[in-house]
């Protein structure tokens, strides 16, 4: 994001928490076929992200609220119970690989992935939102579900609408 622009000034208060939750949303979308009617536990090394997700909102970052809302809508629509759990930074192989990837170091990835993996794609809707993030965009989850359904990639049900959205 453009650091010169004041449009994202609010993001900087909880930017890392928002990015961690964006990773949760991406994982949820990529694993939708495998996680339907199951629990998806995602480990993050950011306490703020864990607490904000547990509360269901953030008082500091409205972009984080958008992502949390999208996770709730997508997970309920797909019948997936998402659990966001805290993990100490670089405390196991998975967290070390993830930390390396966040620094564009791919050297540890191949040993972790093995040979039987396939590429999973993040929905274009998320990429589009990342290019032009909007605060309080409570339709993001619905747009993601519409894209997943249009690809025929899952057994999605009608989009879930939380009571507070109306």
Question: What are these model-predicted stretches?
Answer:
Residues 1-22, 48-58:
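A short, polar/acidic, helix/strand-boundary loop motif
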Residues 3-7, 14, 32, 37, ...:
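Detector for Asparagine
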Residues 6, 51, 55, 110, ...:
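Intrinsically disordered, low-complexity segments enriched in small/polar residues
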Residues 24, 28-98:
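RNase H catalytic domain
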Residues 78-147:
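C-terminal functional segments of enzyme domains
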Residues 135-166:
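RNase H-like DDE catalytic core and adjacent DNA/metal-binding regions
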